[in-house]
């Protein structure tokens, strides 16, 4: 019931005061010129696919009558994917194909879905953030991985790292058991759920009605409050 109320409020917020457009059904593609970027931020109802390549490239696929309202702009090294202000869409097809040599930051909000078709690699760190009803799915390989999921969003990861720092709140879900981490620090609150792995050490904190489930032989330090649980899978 709470999630239904949440999505109803979100829909009213998005559509209130907006000019509404219905997708024509005639799907076209358009290559966009772009400055170099290593991060991606997408909101709304976009589907974003990330592919590895030698240079940055952005291709938008959508209904022909919606193309003028799809915005792609690089700000401080982050590709911002959005729609025009005060424009709402119904029955819309909105996909963005992104190619980049390296991506080390992803921010998905609203009802956006961001999927990496190739493993994301960095010599330093990778940070992933999700909110609203957004979803991020990726395989990652970096010394440090940071995730933060809120609202009713989901982050699903595989790969490997030496240090994994994770936060989940609201009714968010972190599906990261397949991320082979040496040292993991996870904090879960609200009604969120976090699934993690550690081979060396695990520091877990859960509050409210949150759940933390873990795999691996890492030495465990845990703290719970309320109706929260921290258990092995």
Where are these regions (language model features)?
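Extended, compositionally simple hydrophobic/Ser/Thr-rich segments
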Residues: 38-50, 96-98, 103-233
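Solvent-exposed adhesion/ligand-recognition segments of exported proteins
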Residues: 70-74
